[in-house]
Amino acid sequence: MKKEIWGFYPPPIGGISIYCKRLAEKLHAIDESVIMRDFAQSGYESECVMRVKNRILEFLKLPFVPKRLIHAQFTNFYLLMMLYLFGWKHDIVLTLHNRRIVLLDGWKRKVVNQLFRRAKYIIYNDPAYTALLREKYDIDSGKIVLLPTYMAPEQSEVKGLTTELEEFINKHEYSISSNAHRVINNVFGDLYGIDQLIDLMNRLVNEKGLDVGMVFCIADIFDHEYYDKCVARIEELGLTEHFCFAVNSPVNGFEVWAHTDLFVRATMSDMEGV
């Protein structure tokens, strides 16, 4: 039986895509029959990564191909729905990387509930998530597997800092770093706590008189309107020289953290990678 990881290979660079990359490469090194189908359409291909050129067609083919084990890393409802509609022939394993699923209601929740019933295993990374999931969905406890979704980086991933980042960090007496996959301001507020970090820097620099630099790595701005508001707030507080937004930077987040004095993850989202 074929064994496939269905997810997103970087770019875009984010916690889930980096995890998928490392998982696919490590499992393929153990068992060459394990491959990853990349739904990110990044254009990257290797002996263990197969690019999905047409997402819809990939799902439509499922009833007509030999049975396989599919380990899905999706959080997008519509991809989960397609897997439910066309993946009935196959063994399904789901990894839930965040709590977005518990926010679904109505017919969407019913679809996901049916997918959960069909799945062989449901992997998640937060013990506190159990109660939330079982409150919303009819899940057999025997299917639930607690497994941290973190894999340490390989030495081959180390690239070094850009000259711009290195100079910014070195010119300040103290340095703090943080990161976000995207700039998101939703019903829960600022998901990655940029507003809190601005307030923190205001207290440290303007109220306490400390020379601190903040490096904030962002893979994708996404919400440009909110991002512009954050930048305007930084300018208003006179903190422009103390903030560096590394947007879509080729530098690895873990290397930035290693070169700064403190890493802060001001978020309500999952943070096992820290």
Predicted segments with their positions:
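Short alpha-helical donor nucleotide-sugar binding micro-motif in glycosyltransferases
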Residues: N248-P250, E255-T260
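Donor nucleotide-sugar binding/catalytic pocket of nucleotide-sugar-dependent glycosyltransferases
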Residues: R117-E135, I139-T163, N170-E173, N179-A180
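Short His-centered aromatic/hydrophobic patch
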Residues: A72-L80, L96-R99
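Nucleotide-activated donor-binding/catalytic signature segment of Leloir-type glycosyltransferases, i.e.
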Residues: V215-D220, Y227-S249
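Acidic donor-binding loop of glycosyltransferase active sites
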Residues: H242, A258-E272
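Conserved donor-binding/catalytic core segment of Leloir-type glycosyltransferases
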Residues: E4, L165-Y192, I198-M201
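Glycosyltransferase donor-sugar binding loop
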Residues: F39-S42, N179, V212-D228
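Membrane-proximal helix-turn-helix segments that form the acceptor-binding/catalytic region
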Residues: L60, W88, R99-Y124
